[in-house]
């Protein structure tokens, strides 16, 4: 009888120990996932008050997985809130209509998947870069300033000090390219 009681006690101890290890592993995994998310472009996009307008549009148009889970590397050329304020209200209203898909295409026009990230935009100079939506963009330099240029010749000034995240870099634009 005491042997049986000892055996039951041993089994219960092992089961509880196994549960604690499993809970600890889940907690460690959750912490790792949370840390990875904090270093993702999605976190940077949502946390940065300079690009709240773009952030809202990106989340509403299903770009969360790209910015949160894709390993990249990705360049996001993010029009600032001020850039969106320059767009006339009729155009902005048509972009907000998710049924026409215009905002999804517009955001895709500002995203480029690259082979490598660099602290220096000069490695991308005068190369045809293909945006996520299939359009062709170029980074050009005039004096000390860099610009993003589309095939129509529209340009946006690329601001200094990009936000560098694990899966890509967020550069700030003074214009929306459309």
Residue ranges with predicted function:
Residues 1-12:
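Sec-dependent bacterial lipoprotein signal peptides
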Residues 14-178:
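Mature, structured domains of secreted/extracytosolic soluble proteins
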């Amino acid at each position: 009888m005491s042997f049986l009681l000892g055996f039951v006690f041993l089994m219960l101890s092992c089961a509880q120990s196994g549960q604690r290890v499993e809970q600890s592993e889940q907690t460690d995994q959750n912490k790792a996932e949370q840390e990875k998310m904090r270093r993702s472009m999605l976190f940077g996009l949502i946390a940065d008050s300079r690009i709240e307008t773009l952030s809202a549009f990106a989340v509403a148009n299903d770009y969360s997985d790209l910015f949160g889970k894709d390993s990249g590397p990705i360049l996001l050329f993010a029009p600032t809130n001020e850039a969106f304020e320059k767009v006339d209200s009729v155009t902005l209203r048509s972009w907000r209509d998710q049924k026409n898909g215009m905002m999804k295409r517009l955001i895709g026009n500002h995203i480029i998947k690259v082979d490598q990230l660099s602290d220096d935009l000069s490695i991308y100079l005068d190369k045809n870069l293909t945006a996520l939506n299939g359009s062709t963009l170029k980074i050009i330099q005039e004096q000390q300033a860099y610009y993003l240029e589309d095939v129509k010749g529209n340009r946006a000034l690329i601001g200094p000090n990009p936000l560098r995240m694990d899966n890509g870099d967020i550069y700030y634009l003074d214009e929306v390219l459309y």
